[in-house]
Structures are given as structure tokens and as C-alpha cells.
Curated annotation (Swiss-Prot):
<keyword id="KW-0804">Transcription</keyword>
<dbReference type="GO" id="GO:0000428">
    <property type="term" value="C:DNA-directed RNA polymerase complex"/>
</dbReference>
<feature type="binding site">
    <location>
        <position position="88"/>
    </location>
    <ligand>
        <name>Zn(2+) 1</name>
    </ligand>
</feature>
<feature type="binding site">
    <location>
        <position position="914"/>
    </location>
    <ligand>
        <name>Zn(2+) 2</name>
    </ligand>
</feature>
<dbReference type="InterPro" id="IPR045867">
    <property type="entry name" value="DNA-dir_RpoC_beta_prime"/>
</dbReference>
<dbReference type="GO" id="GO:0006351">
    <property type="term" value="P:DNA-templated transcription"/>
</dbReference>
<dbReference type="InterPro" id="IPR000722">
    <property type="entry name" value="RNA_pol_asu"/>
</dbReference>
<feature type="binding site">
    <location>
        <position position="461"/>
    </location>
    <ligand>
        <name>Mg(2+)</name>
    </ligand>
</feature>
<dbReference type="InterPro" id="IPR007080">
    <property type="entry name" value="RNA_pol_Rpb1_1"/>
</dbReference>
<feature type="region of interest" description="Disordered">
    <location>
        <begin position="1389"/>
        <end position="1409"/>
    </location>
</feature>
<keyword id="KW-0479">Metal-binding</keyword>
<dbReference type="InterPro" id="IPR007081">
    <property type="entry name" value="RNA_pol_Rpb1_5"/>
</dbReference>
<keyword id="KW-0862">Zinc</keyword>
<keyword id="KW-0548">Nucleotidyltransferase</keyword>
<keyword id="KW-0808">Transferase</keyword>
<feature type="binding site">
    <location>
        <position position="70"/>
    </location>
    <ligand>
        <name>Zn(2+) 1</name>
    </ligand>
</feature>
<feature type="binding site">
    <location>
        <position position="72"/>
    </location>
    <ligand>
        <name>Zn(2+) 1</name>
    </ligand>
</feature>
């Protein structure tokens, strides 16, 4: 009887396990799990469609094909449950066991598992110390291996050819040793290994060995050994005696019509194995010749290889259609494998998709859902309500009713969808705002209506985009959708904490038009309908705007006057305003009518000053931000909706449109062009005379045109933004223009100055497909029209833009995927980790300009120590206090230049990150909550703009966006010039010439505070002496941006050394000019070192013998600018190194740059950096490299070898600091980490990544990049093991290393020593603790092989592994501390229980009393 009841039991909770272990299966395990041996290759009988007995689909082994029915039909239905039929041997149970029952194949000879053989490094090879090549020879029957040398002089595991083996047998006798071929022999070898003994041997070997290579190799072997030791796996299990057979339902065979079958590739692969295995058994029974048996064994090995991993060795086995068969490994690997296709992303029920249209009348929390779609999505809910209401009695009748669409159904639908949020999603979902929840509003038609303000977040437009709708079913999911995902709760962007719900396009234009002011308007002639023109000046006649200068007693009066038509929207008026924020008395305020009308929609807590200005897109964004900070979320949502309405309304009333005459071409255009052409001719002449090189000429020409384009654009914008007119009684006057194109660009509604430049200025320089700039610019603009040649030149750029877009989208998506993968387990795990470490943050400056103020960088962070006012010593911010907007203002007012804050990088939490180190949750505006998945947010914030930018490259239409190179520094303030570690010499003209690389100049005020600071280039000419007075706008320094000079510090006579024509130097003849110049070339003779020596003219402290006072080595490619034996003075240029011809900067250079930084790749020509502070001297050359020696004040000098021909940027006798480059080139992040440590590296990475995004005008908060960098720095490399169980060169998690050391130190032993390790994001993802997460990322087979050998346990701590296992993720509401909270739906039970328990006072008795 109990059997029957158990039928209704719920299945076991799928979440009741807490960890998963993977290990190598032993033959016993395989047989134990199997339900029978598959002996025949047959599948099913083609006539009866019943499975063949003992075949691949056998019902006896795998279970019945029909529920509760045996194969021959003797036993049917539930009553015979569990009986085994005596006729056909099939158990009477549900057919679903065919999805879980395994079979097995007993092999006639052992075979090697290809994963352990071929997955590099080969594990079998590592254990036996045989190379993969030899191992394959043995396994595929081309060579013999000695499995037991006994007492012969042969080596264990020695590999030899057949001839040698036979010779040895003759020499030592047949029983003197044992050996063989194929997997059997290898299995014997593996069995013979004593893990403990070998491990001990290797450890001693490692201690004693001197060569680095040997130690590394031994360490690798030890690693595999230790893995086997600790996991309890036996090495011989890597050789298979029997193979498991997958359950048949997982490799189905489906009959098609016409008598054919569609089958899974696995069946073919299994059939091959079974056929070959059976043939081999027969051959062995028949005692066939050795050759034939060997061949058959080899074929069996190949068949098993193909089954496990087809194509890994040799050619892939192809099916009948010439397509390689999909093996077990292929089922797991790649985008369409099990992990990524079915476990990490599934298709779901209760969803639909449709085209979107704009819904301007919706509220922010609503979306329009087509009735048809709602009816389908909410079906079960509708059936339930219909039954509840008594309209129907059965589900069937409810179904009919809904199909007929009776009026009752629509009423019920209205009720069902009330307050039931739905989720809208637009692909590609690049950040979390790509899925948001809305309350549905039923609409006619078939398109989903979307609120215009959320388009930015979805990156949606209405040109045919589609969106998907999903329905949260359970009460919990509805609560989450409403509280966390509702569009009204996602006003701020998680990437930078500024509002993302901001009016755009028409709405901006409307608000901008409302809040503009004007004093005069044009006069239209009643009769002609055209504007009146003043005869004398030829300018249009304007008159005063209606209502200008009127005074009102309050905003309501303004509204009445405006509605009555007495004042104009843009009229400037005076209004008496109450200040609702503070209780000051009302004031008279100068404003415009439009601004007063806009004030009506503001909440009381936002002051009028927030809208008393011209509202462009940026100001509107600030307004929403201000409202969010001053009022609350609800007020902000209401404001956003009102802004939308008022924006659309007044954009409509403004009636702004574009016409050709709006594109005003500047009058000075021809003049600027002629001037530029003349300059180009002049440069050309200089080149023909040989004064400059071709590269310099090209760079200068490009520069002239870039400047001309900028000048024309500037004049055009000035023209557009102002208009001149004639006013009777006033005369000629001008004020800001109401030109439609200018208004659109100025307000930020549509278009950019770049685009207007192309419409009405000149298109400018274009790039070739290779990225170089074509030196003839397009001088026309779109209004004038392009000539055929100009049009042809511009097609390059346009096409490149389209091609880039396609490629970059994929690249950016891949970057995001890697970032998410590396950061997925960075979760807020605790309140405070109690660290005493943090980062020092200061303002970011570039070229003396502050690009990011300290305030923006510390906002939303937590102070590490008390922040004190430098003058009064008061505490501005207490330690561990969140720095909010008010505190930022206090810090900035106090003039602090550096602030210590807590950072994710220095957080001491073991798993995850603590709330204090992270700071503010940018999307919510308060301290971050426990369980927030900050890693994924960081990854999305960095990845999302990547795709945005790459999708947007082509909008400029391929114009080369290149600025004229900066050639001088101008001062921004008055003050006194100060040199900061700057070496200079005074040249013949009396200017200071900069002679070192990291020098800076600063302008200080009377009190000595630095007002501005600039890095100055080597070779720059400083115009003012130190301590000299600086005036604002005065030139401080000048330099040539196209060449890198080599300067002399001494005056004297030039003497060439090793500069031999045809050996180290060649005279390059310029085709065009016929003049030659001396260029250093790479010389075959490594002893030759081209240099220029300066001989003293007497008086200088010269070298006594040679008279040399200075020597300068010349790199390859340097152009010599002085003659031998000529006389020069200090500060003169003796040679020039041309800089690279500039290519256009674009995120196409940017995205790969970001990827390069996060992958921690070594740059191509990276600079060697000094590891210590000290003085520089040159040593003897070695192996064609130059030797630079850095000698510190105390301690050993360090030597660096620098490749010949690279320009060394330090001179003999210079003082260098640790981390300073000794040559030109980009920094290598690994060097920075080694020399300067974690914080400097983090600073470098954050700044570099930010620079790429800043170029594109994308804002990302620093903390996101820090989170990723933290994940890249999680591991350390062991340098010295001490008394720990770690291995040399092992990479372990930092906290594992620390715990291990703590343990050893507590016992009073020697701790291990390690160095920090910087892993690229791909490497870091693959080396996570969880093998499930790593396997689903990349290199699936490799990860699983390693995990199996180690017997790894996955404790399911990250997000990905839990998604794969189908559990709640341990973040957000799935955090383990929240998981145990359950919702009680029926409220009756707990109360009843409570009444039964003792400690509850009985209410009824109390009432009676």
C-alpha cells in the first residue's frame, strides 16, 4: 500500500546538497552505476520500432519505452509496478528512467582517456615523465615501454622502438623485464607508481636542483602528484577498462516520415566503439596474428578518443554528411554547449515579444500592453478568476470562454493585471537597466507602448525595435519586481550615479525654448508675410518682445498674463518670489515668463534658482539630480513625468523646424582657406629646400588643415549663435540667436557641433582605411555639396565606420562577458572588514588642467581617517563616515588636495567585499546593501559603454577627429614661475632649455600655493626664468610636437663616433627635393655604437686624454642635424627622432586598449623601468644590448639591458626614482606591480582605463574599475615555500596563502614568501575556486580534467555555479541570511498555533475580565 502513496510524494528538494565534487571514475564505479552491459551496436528494430535487446537502446538495461509497460506487453499499467517481466526482462516502471539509467561497455583491452592524454600539460605524461610524443607512440602501437625493468639495466618507463625491444629481449632474456605496447603497458606503469615515495623523491630533487628549468618541471610533476595524493584518485584510472554509456533519452533516435531516422551523433560514435570492441574480442578468441590485433586495438583506442573528444587527435571522424560528429566534449563546449546554451541561459514560459511604439501619455511606472498579449500571458490567472467568480465551473469551459473573448473575460483581465508588474527587456541587455518592471496598461493594437524617458536606459528607439515581456508569477518575484526593478526605482545610473531618467530630444528642445530669454523679436510685414528689412543697414527690423520689463507680484500673475497673451514666453520680467526652501522674505527676481511657468512643476523643496537659467540637457539632468537629493524618489518621478509633458507640449508650440537657410556658411571661410593654402605652399617650399623631412612636412600640413577646420567651425558657430538686427530708436543690435540648428545642438536635443561643422563649415580631414590621414581635406560642406573627388574620399570613412561597428559590437560583448566572469563573485559580504589601509586620492590633472576634481572622485566613498581642515584643524569628516555632497563641498572649500579614502582594493574581506570599503551604492544614493552583486554591476558599467561607443564611431562619418597638436603652454593665472625638479641649460638665445624628463613647472601665488602645474617635455624652451612673473595668457614654454630632440648640455665642438656611412648611417636622398640627410640605421656590427661627442673648447672640465665633455648615443632612425667638427652651444639640437605619424584617436583604438589593460598584457615595446632610486651610468654593451647601470646611495647597483636602437631617455649622471622608465615606450603593468606595488598599479590601471572612456565623454565611477582590478590581484605566486605545504611557483589565492602562513607561524615554523601576481581577466576567471564557473567560461575540457584529477569540491559560493545548478544565487534577496525567511501566505495557521502555546495570554479571558 505504501508504494502507492509514495507515488504522490514530492521529489526531493533539488537544493538539499551544498557542494559538488568531481573526480576520476574507477572501473568499479562505472560498473556499479551501470544497469547492464551494452553488447550489440544495434539500436531499434526498423519494423517494430522496438529497441533491440542488449543494444544501445535496450529496454532491459535502460528501462521501458512506455510508462508502466514491459517490452513484450505482458505486464501493463500501475498494478504491476516494480515487477520484472520474465519473458523480456524489462522492469515495469515509468519510462522517464531512460533519462537517468547508465549502461556500460566492457572493453577487450584498456584504452587511455584522451582528456588525460592530450589536454595540455598531458597528465599521464607528467606522472610518468614521458613526453607526449613518446606517449602517443606507445598508445598507438608504434613503440614499446618498459613497465618493470626488474633486474635489467633498463629504465622504468623507457620508451623504445620495436627493434630495440626485441634486441633487449634477446640480450637480457624474455623474463628479465616486462614491457609492452598500448594502453595496457601504460596502465602497468601507472599502477607501479608509489605516489608517496615519488613525491618525496621529487621534493628532495627540487631542493637540490640548481637549474631553474629543472625546478619548474619538477614543480609541475609534483603538482599532478599532489593532486592525485590528496584526492584519492588512482593514476591507473586514467586508463579505461570499461566505458559508461549515456542514457538513451539523452542521445535520442527519432523516426522521421519516410522510414528514415534522425539520430544523435553519439549513437554513431558508440556504435563504432562497440563494433571494434566486438571484433577485437573475436580476433583474440581466434588467436589472430599480433599485427592484426594491434591494429584493431589501435582502432578501438581511436574510436574511444572520438567518442570522448572528436577531432582532438588526428582528423575528426565525419558522419554521412561529411560533418564532424559531435562528441561528448563538444556537447559541453562553446556557446552552443550544455553550459552556455541550456544552463546559463534558458528560454522561459510566460513571455512574449512585440514591436515597441512610444507612449507619451504613460506615467513613468507604466507600459502599454496589447490586449491580445495580456490575454495570452495572464491565462492561468484569468481561468482562476473566472472560476472564482462563478462564470465557469471547469478549466475546459474557462478555456472556451477565453477563446471566444466574451466581455466578462475583458473585465476579469482588467482585474487580474491590476498591480501585477511585468518585466520588459530589450536585447542586447548590456546592463541591469536593460530589464525593468512596469505596471501594464491594456491598449488596443499589437505593439507594446514604452515610456519615452526609459529609452535611454534600454538604448531603445522606435525605428522597429522589439522588446520582450516577461511575467513574474510568485508573490515574492512580484515584490522584487516592484521594489527593485520598477522603472521608478531606477532613476540613477549604477555606472556613475547621475540620473539616467533624463528628458531627451524633443523634451529637451521644449524646455530649452521655454527658458531662453530674448529682448527683441522680428517684425513681419502684414501684407507680404515676410520680415521687414531696414533699408540702410540691410538688417532685419526687430521690435521689443511683448511684456519685456514688466513687474509681477507673484508667479500666478505671470501665468494669468501669459494665458491672456499679454506677455511673451521669452520676455524678461521681474517677479516677486517666495523662497519655499528657507524662510527668507520674498525677493524680486529677474527671470523670464517661461521659467516661471516651468517653476510650477517643481516640488516645494527645490529652489527656483534650479530652473532660473537656460535649461539644456545637462541642466535638466542636474535638475533631476537636485530633486532626487533635495526631495525624494516619489517627487523626482512626478517631476520627470511633468518635465516630459511640458517638454513635448512646448516643443510642439515652438514649431521649430530646419531649412537650408539655417545653415549659415561663415563669410570668412574663403579667407581662412586661402591663408591655409598659402601656409601649405610655404611648408612645401621648406621641404623642397630640405629644411624639414617628409614626415615633418606631412605632420605640419595636417596641422594647418586641422587648425583651419577649427577656425572655420569657430566662426560658423559664432555666426549661428548670434544674430544682428536693427531696432528703431536703438539702432543695430545683436543677441543670442534662435536659429533652429543652433538651438538643437546648443540644447543637446540632437546633433553636435561636429555635425554642424560638416553642414555649414567644412568637412575637414578624412582618414584612409589604414587610419592615416589624407592630407588634402574636404573644403566643402554638405550645404555647398561635395565634388566627385571629395565624395569619393569620404566614402572610405563611411564604409570603415560600418565595418567597425559590426566588429566592435562583438568585441565589446566579449569584453563584457570576460569582465562579468571575473567579477561575478564580488558580492558585499559584510558591513566592515576593519582594514586600516586605503588609497590617497587627489584631483586628476592633464596638461595643467584639472580634468576631474577631487570632489567627484571621493563622492560616495568612505573616509579612512579623520579628514581635518588644514588651517583650523577641525574635523571635516570623521573616520569611516560616508562622504556625501555636503561633505564634498566642505572638503573642496577647505582646499584639501589629498584625501585618504577606503577602497575595494585594500578591503580585507575574505570572500566578497565589505560595505564600508565600497561606499555608496550609486544607483540608490545611499550606503551599499548586504548582498549587492557589485562585481557584476562593475562589469556591466565598464562593458556597456564599450558597445555604445563602438556602435557610435561612424556617426561623425569617418572625419578625422584630430586636434591641432599642442605646441605651447599658456598660463591660466597671474603669479610667479617655479621649477620642480627641472634641469635646464641656457641656450644661445638666453632661454632655459629643459634637459630632463619628469620635470614640472608651476605657477604659484603670493602665499606660495600652487595655482597650476604642468609636466614639461624634454627639449622644451621655457620663456620665463624661475622666480619670474607670469601673466595670465602668457606663454610659459614651447616645443616641437613632431620630433623628439637630442640636446647637448655643453658648448663645444662636434665629433662623430662610429657614424660610418653604409654601416651605421645612411644618407637618405629625398626624391622630391634631391637633398640628403643623415639617418642612423641598424648596424650588423654590434660593436659599433653611433654617437656624437662634444669636445671642450678649453676651460670646461674635459676628459684629460680625449678632451670629451659630453657623449650622446644615437638610436636607430635619428636624423643628425649637426655637421662633424662644427661648433655648437648648450641647448642646441644635435639630432631629431621623428615621432610616429599621428593616427586618429577613436575608441577603436580605445576598446582594444581597455581589453589590453584588463588582460594585463605586456605592451609590444614596453619600457624598462628602474627598480630603485639612484644615479645612472652606462656600462659595456653585451649581446647587442646596451647596459644601463643604476647605482643607489646605499646597496647594490642594478643593471638593465636595453635593446640596441631603442632611445634611452636618461643621460649619464641623471638621478632616477624607482618606477621611472629608462627608455621610451609604454609601461608594463607587471613591472609597476613588482617595483611600486599594488596601489600604484591600481592607480595606473584606473587612470589608463578612465582616459580611454574620457576621450569618448563616457563617465564611469572609479570604484567599478577598482573592483575588477581587485579581482585581477587576488592571487600570489610562491617564491619560497618555507615550512608550508605550498609549492614553489604555485599560484594561490591571497587569503589561502595568509591562512597557511598563520598556521605555520603559530607552530613557530618558517612562513612562505610570495609576490603579488597580476592576472588578466581571462586567466583570473579560469583560476577561480569554482570549477563549474571556470568550465562554463572557457577551455571547458582543460578545466574539468584538472578538477577531476584534484577531486575538486565546488562549494557553490559564486553566482554562476548556482545558476548552473538551478539554485537561488547567493546575492541580493538570495543571500543565505535572507534565504531562511519564508513568506506565510495563509495567516490563519500561525495564530492558531500561537494560541495553543503557553506563553500567549488568552485574549478572550482578558476581554471578559
Amino acid at each position: 500500500m505504501e508504494d502507492y502513496f509514495s507515488f504522490f510524494d514530492k521529489p526531493k528538494d533539488p537544493l538539499h546538497f551544498s557542494a559538488i565534487r568531481i573526480s576520476v571514475s574507477s572501473p568499479e564505479k562505472i560498473r556499479e552505476r551501470s544497469h547492464g552491459e551494452v553488447k550489440k551496436p544495434e539500436t531499434i528494430n526498423y519494423r517494430t520500432f522496438k529497441p533491440e535487446r542488449d543494444g544501445l537502446f535496450c529496454a532491459k538495461i535502460f528501462g521501458p519505452t512506455k510508462d508502466y509497460e514491459c517490452n513484450c506487453g505482458k505486464y501493463k499499467r500501475m498494478k504491476h509496478r516494480g515487477i520484472i517481466c520474465e519473458k523480456c526482462g524489462v522492469e515495469v516502471i515509468p519510462s522517464k528512467v531512460r533519462r537517468e539509467r547508465l549502461g556500460h561497455i566492457d572493453l577487450a583491452t584498456p584504452v587511455a582517456h584522451i582528456w588525460f592524454l592530450k589536454s595540455l600539460p598531458s597528465r599521464i605524461g607528467n606522472l610518468l615523465d614521458i613526453t607526449l610524443k613518446d606517449l602517443e607512440k606507445v598508445l598507438y602501437f608504434e613503440a614499446f615501454v618498459i613497465s618493470d625493468p626488474k633486474n635489467s639495466p633498463l629504465q622504468f618507463c623507457e620508451v623504445m622502438s620495436e627493434d630495440k625491444f626485441l634486441k633487449a629481449q634477446q640480450e637480457y632474456g624474455y623474463d628479465a623485464f616486462s614491457g609492452g605496447m598500448g594502453a595496457e603497458a601504460i596502465r602497468e606503469c601507472l599502477k607501479a607508481i608509489d605516489l608517496d615515495e615519488l613525491s618525496g623523491q621529487l621534493r628532495t630533487e627540487m631542493m637540490e636542483s640548481t637549474s631553474e628549468a629543472k625546478r619548474k618541471k619538477t614543480a609541475k610533476r609534483l603538482k599532478v602528484l599532489e593532486a592525485f595524493k590528496s584526492s584519492g584518485n588512482k593514476p591507473e584510472w586514467m586508463i579505461l577498462e570499461c566505458i559508461p554509456v549515456l542514457p538513451p533519452e539523452l542521445r535520442p533516435l527519432v523516426p522521421l516520415d519516410g522510414g528514415r531516422f534522425a539520430t544523435s551523433d553519439l549513437n554513431d560514435l558508440y556504435r563504432r566503439v562497440i563494433n571494434r570492441n566486438n571484433r577485437l574480442k573475436r580476433l583474440v578468441e581466434l588467436q589472430a596474428p599480433e599485427v592484426i590485433i594491434r591494429n584493431e586495438k589501435r582502432m578501438l583506442q581511436e574510436a574511444v578518443d572520438a567518442l570522448f573528444d572528436n577531432g582532438r587527435r588526428g582528423r575528426a571522424i565525419a558522419g554521412p554528411n561529411k560533418r564532424p560528429l559531435k562528441s561528448l566534449s563538444d556537447m559541453l563546449k562553446g556557446k552552443s554547449g550544455r553550459f552556455r546554451q541550456n544552463l546559463l541561459g534558458k528560454r522561459v514560459d510566460y513571455s512574449g515579444r512585440s514591436v515597441i511604439v512610444v507612449g507619451p501619455e504613460l506615467k513613468l511606472h507604466q507600459c502599454g500592453l496589447p490586449k491580445k498579449m495580456a490575454l495570452e500571458l495572464f491565462k492561468p490567472f484569468i481561468y482562476n478568476k473566472l472560476e472564482e467568480r462563478g462564470y465557469v465551473t471547469t478549466i475546459k469551459s474557462a478555456k472556451k470562454m477565453v477563446e471566444k473573448e466574451r466581455p466578462e473575460v475583458w473585465d476579469v483581465l482588467e482585474e487580474v493585471i491590476r498591480e501585477h508588474p511585468v518585466m520588459l527587456n530589450r536585447a542586447p541587455t548590456l546592463h541591469r537597466l536593460g530589464i525593468q518592471a512596469f505596471e501594464p496598461v491594456l491598449i488596443e493594437g499589437k505593439a507594446i507602448q514604452l515610456h519615452p524617458l526609459v529609452c535611454t536606459a534600454f538604448n531603445a528607439d522606435f525605428d522597429g525595435d522589439q522588446m520582450a515581456v516577461h511575467l513574474p508569477l510568485s508573490v515574492e518575484s512580484q515584490v522584487e519586481a516592484r521594489v527593485l526593478m520598477m522603472s521608478t526605482n531606477n532613476i540613477l545610473s549604477p555606472a556613475h550615479g547621475k540620473p539616467i531618467i533624463v528628458p531627451s530630444q524633443d523634451m529637451v528642445l521644449g524646455a530649452y525654448y521655454m527658458t531662453r530669454d530674448r529682448r527683441f523679436e522680428r517684425v513681419i510685414d502684414e501684407t507680404t508675410g515676410k520680415e521687414k528689412i531696414d533699408a540702410e543697414s540691410g538688417l532685419p527690423i526687430y521690435r521689443k518682445v511683448k511684456g519685456t520689463g514688466k513687474v509681477f507680484s507673484g508667479p500666478d500673475e505671470v501665468r494669468i498674463a501669459f494665458d491672456a497673451g499679454e506677455v511673451d514666453m521669452q520676455a524678461t520680467v521681474k517677479v516677486r518670489m517666495k523662497n519655499l526652501v528657507s524662510d527668507e522674505k520674498p525677493q524680486m527676481i529677474d527671470t523670464t515668463v517661461g521659467r516661471v511657468i516651468l517653476k510650477e512643476i517643481l516640488p516645494d523643496s527645490v529652489p527656483f534658482s534650479a530652473v532660473n537659467k537656460v535649461m539644456n540637457k545637462k541642466e535638466l539632468s542636474n535638475l533631476v539630480d537636485t530633486c532626487y537629493r533635495m526631495a525624494d524618489n516619489k517627487e523626482t518621478v512626478i517631476l520627470a513625468d511633468k518635465l516630459k509633458d511640458i517638454g513635448f507640449r512646448y516643443a510642439n508650440l515652438a514649431g521649430i523646424s530646419i531649412c537650408l537657410d539655417d545653415m549659415v556658411i561663415p563669410e570668412g571661410k574663403t579667407e581662412i582657406l586661402t591663408k591655409a593654402e598659402d601656409e601649405v605652399k610655404e611648408i612645401q617650399n621648406q621641404y623642397t629646400e630640405g629644411l624639414i623631412t617628409d614626415g615633418e612636412r606631412y605632420n605640419k600640413v595636417i596641422d594647418i588643415w586641422a587648425k583651419a577646420t577649427e577656425d572655420i567651425a569657430k566662426e560658423m558657430l559664432d555666426n549661428l549663435s548670434k544674430e544682428k538686427f536693427f531696432v528703431e530708436g536703438v539702432g543695430v543690435s545683436e543677441e543670442a540667436s534662435f536659429n533652429a540648428i543652433h538651438m538643437m545642438a546648443d540644447s543637446g536635443a540632437r546633433g553636435s557641433h561636429q555635425q554642424i561643422r560638416q553642414l555649414a563649415g567644412m568637412r575637414g580631414l578624412m582618414a584612409k582605411p589604414s587610419g592615416e590621414i589624407i592630407e588634402t581635406p574636404i573644403t566643402a560642406n554638405f550645404r555647398e555639396g561635395l565634388t566627385v573627388l571629395q565624395y569619393f574620399i569620404s566614402t572610405h570613412g563611411a564604409r570603415k565606420g560600418l565595418a567597425d561597428t559590426a566588429l566592435k559590437t562583438a568585441n565589446s560583448g566579449y569584453l563584457t562577458r570576460r569582465l562579468v566572469d571575473v567579477a561575478q563573485d564580488a558580492i558585499i559580504a559584510e558591513e566592515d572588514c576593519g582594514t586600516l589601509d586605503g588609497l590617497v586620492v587627489s584631483s586628476l590633472t592633464e596638461g595643467g588642467e584639472v580634468i576631474e576634481h577631487i570632489g567627484d572622485r571621493i563622492l560616495g566613498r568612505v573616509a579612512l581617517d579623520d579628514i581635518l581642515d588644514p588651517i583650523t584643524g577641525d574635523v571635516l569628516v570623521a573616520a569611516n563616515e560616508d562622504i556625501d555632497e555636503n561633505l564634498v563641498k566642505r572638503i573642496e572649500d577647505a582646499g584639501l588636495e589629498k584625501v585618504k579614502i577606503r577602497s575595494v582594493l585594500t578591503c580585507q574581506s575574505r570572500r566578497g567585499i565589505c560595505s564600508k570599503c565600497y561606499g555608496r551604492d550609486l544607483a540608490r544614493g545611499h550606503s551599499v546593501n548586504m548582498g549587492e552583486a557589485v562585481g557584476v554591476i562593475a562589469a556591466q558599467s565598464i562593458g556597456e559603454p564599450g558597445t555604445q561607443l563602438t556602435m557610435r564611431t561612424f556617426h561623425i562619418g569617418g572625419t578625422a577627429s584630430r586636434r591641432a597638436e599642442q605646441t605651447s603652454l599658456e598660463s591660466r593665472t597671474d603669479g610667479i614661475l617655479k621649477f620642480i625638479n627641472l634641469n635646464t641649460v641656457i641656450n644661445a638665445e638666453g632661454h632655459h632649455i629643459v634637459m630632463n624628463r619628469n620635470g614640472e613647472i608651476a605657477v604659484v601665488d603670493e602665499t606660495g600655493r600652487e595655482r597650476e602645474k604642468y609636466l614639461v617635455l624634454y627639449g622644451a624652451k621655457i620663456k620665463i626664468a624661475p622666480g619670474g612673473a607670469v601673466t595670465q595668457g602668457g606663454i610659459l614654454a614651447e616645443w616641437d610636437p613632431y620630433t623628439m630632440p637630442i640636446l647637448t648640455e655643453f658648448s663645444g665642438k662636434v665629433k662623430f663616433g662610429d657614424i660610418v656611412e653604409g654601416v651605421t648611417m645612411e644618407e637618405q636622398l629625398d626624391e622630391v627635393t634631391g637633398l640628403s640627410r643623415k639617418v642612423i640605421i641598424e648596424s650588423k656590427d654590434s660593436d659599433k655604437r653611433p654617437r656624437i661627442a662634444i669636445k671642450g673648447m678649453g676651460g670646461d672640465s674635459a676628459d684629460a686624454v680625449t678632451g670629451t665633455i659630453g657623449r650622446y648615443f644615437l638610436p636607430v632612425g635619428a636624423n643628425i642635424t649637426v655637421q662633424d667638427d662644427s661648433v655648437i652651444s648648450a641647448g642646441d639640437i644635435i639630432a631629431k627622432i621623428p615621432r610616429e605619424t599621428t593616427k586618429t584617436k577613436d575608441i577603436t583604438g580605445g576598446l582594444p586598449r581597455v581589453a589590453e589593460l584588463f588582460e594585463a598584457r605586456k605592451p609590444k615595446d614596453f619600457a624598462v623601468i628602474s627598480e630603485i632610486d639612484g644615479r645612472v651610468s652606462y656600462g659595456k654593451d653585451a649581446k647587442g644590448k646596451r647596459k644601463v647601470i643604476v647605482t643607489p646611495e646605499m646597496g647594490e647597483p642594478k643593471e638593465y639591458l636595453i635593446p640596441k636602437g631603442k632611445h634611452i631617455s636618461v643621460h649619464e649622471g641623471d638621478h632616477v626614482r624607482a618606477g621611472e622608465p629608462l627608455m621610451d615606450g609604454s609601461s608594463n603593468p607587471h613591472d609597476i606591480l613588482r617595483v611600486l606595488g599594488v596601489k600604484e598599479l591600481a592607480k595606473y590601471l584606473v587612470d589608463e582605463v578612465q582616459e580611454v572612456y574620457r576621450l569618448q565623454g563616457v563617465k564611469i565611477n572609479d570604484k567599478h574599475i577598482e573592483v575588477i582590478v581587485r579581482q585581477m590581484l587576488r592571487r600570489v605566486r610562491i617564491k619560497d615555500v618555507g615550512d608550508t605545504s605550498l609549492l614553489v611557483d604555485d599560484q594561490v589565492e591571497r587569503w589561502v596563502f595568509e591562512t597557511e602562513n598563520q598556521k605555520v607561524m603559530n607552530e613557530g615554523k618558517r612562513p612562505a614568501i610570495a609576490e603579488p601576481l597580476l592576472l588578466g581577466i581571462t586567466k583570473a576567471s579560469l583560476s577561480t575556486e569554482s570549477f563549474i564557473s571556470a568550465a562554463s567560461f572557457q577551455e571547458t575540457t582543460k578545466v574539468l580534467t584538472q578538477a577531476a584529477i584534484e577531486g575538486k569540491v565546488d562549494y557553490l559560493r559564486g553566482l554562476k555555479e548556482n545558476v548552473i545548478m538551478g539554485r537561488l544565487i547567493p546575492a541580493g534577496t538570495g543571500l543565505s541570511s535572507y534565504r531562511n525567511i519564508r513568506m506565510l501566505t495563509e495567516a490563519s495557521e500561525p495564530v492558531a498555533q500561537a494560541a495553543e502555546s503557553e506563553d500567549v495570554p488568552d485574549v478572550s479571558q482578558q476581554e471578559a475580565a
